[in-house]
Amino acid sequence: MSAGRTFEGAGCVTWWGFGPARDLLNSDTHKVRLQEELNVLLVGSGDPRHILKTITGLTHSDTLHVWVIENSMEVIARQLLLLYISLLPPDKMSVHKKTEVFLEVFGNLEIRKETEESVKKAAAQLSISITYSLSSDSLSHSCLDTSLLKFKERDELVRIFKLWERPPSAPASVSKVWDARVRQHLGSRYDSRQGAFDWDLNMKLHQRGCGVINKHQYAKWRETGVTFEMREGLYQTANQSLLSTRVFNHRGNGVALRGYWGDIVSSPYLSFGIETENKELLKTQNNHYVKTAQDISEVNLLELFECLAARGRSPLNEDPPNTSSSCCQSTESRKTEENSQSDPSASQTQPVEHSPTQELDLLNVNGVKVSFLSPDSLSKLPLKSKYRNLFNTIFCSASMVHQLDSALREIAAPDAALVIELATFLLDLSKEQVSGFAVKVKEIAEESGFTPAHDQNSDKYAVFTQKNN
């Protein structure tokens, strides 16, 4: 059963998750046994939220290997782009600017010209590095591994990155593309769409625990596809990373159309903006949240990027930092970084523009590696001895649940956890369908040799642990 396949609101391409970021090795419902290397398999996560969150929970001695399967190369390309931005060293981009750029690329169909330049630069470097990996056994970066993809898949990645680097000179209006999706989804309700937006927010998202999503910001996204506006400026440039090709049947012939085929109802706020450990951000006044999902997304990502900077090291720095005490930078070092960003003389010492190199000039995050697997690889993993009993945690999105079967037990490590995204935030589903989906998920997990974890009270994810034989 796949809850997210053809429901028009959710779209057919998963650009972001339908649930908040989780530490997949350590949570209230399960803790993975510590060992030399921890292996996590992500099936259809759509974005790097779980990767970033899981890294924050690592100790200085942990080694983490994340294996990623997505259902299209366009989603893999975007995952690589978002990880590239996440791993930019502080001397290239401060954590504050990185947070803004990440969120803009992550959730906005239209971005600022400055942000487009960041995307083009990243695409150019990723294209060169993957081309290099095609002719060499060496990895272009210790954390990002595309070597397990087929040659034709890596060729496809290069094609996508070059399209981002040099987009069409006369592109179709993405605002019209977005509006066409909204019209198709709402049908006769289009002329009263503000009422439809309010209904989805108040009667669905707010009722399902997303009260921090602001009415005006949500309506702006539903109307225009622009989610995050941290800076004043013109958000008028197409975000190429959110555009993909879909083949339609026209009079018996396949017609490929490039457009936006992702979510138009649930919102990008779900990944980073609806949960926080900082209770100050959840304060209310007159029964309204003082802060918004955008504010929470900014704070959460800032903390995640500070953790990456503390665990990682610049390619020019041979000595890894001490991460045994805390993964967050000190306030003093953060101030120093901000001062260097605002000091004109400091900025003059930085290189202005360099042509892309084979080596990705990114943070080397100590003990962390992310490997991308082919979209059709899930059913083939049990056939390869290297994956047998390998994964400590297996995550599966709501849109990919239909691919799970009893072969899971062959690739799951002893005491492994299975985490499945539920359909709570697929707004086109009725309450009965959401409940039915949860029942189906439980059946699939049990048939695969897993049992529900104790003390579960989440309606966002179902967590299972491997049965003891």
Swiss-Prot record:
GO cellular component, one term: dynein axonemal particle
Main localization, broad class: cytoplasm
Region (Disordered): 313-356
Superkingdom, taxonomy of origin: Eukaryota
Localisation per UniProt entry: Cytoplasm; Dynein axonemal particle
Tissue-level expression: Mainly expressed in cell types that express axonemal dyneins.
Family: Belongs to the DNAAF3 family.
Main function: Required for the assembly of axonemal inner and outer dynein arms. Involved in preassembly of dyneins into complexes before their transport into cilia.
Protein name: Dynein axonemal assembly factor 3
Organism: Danio rerio
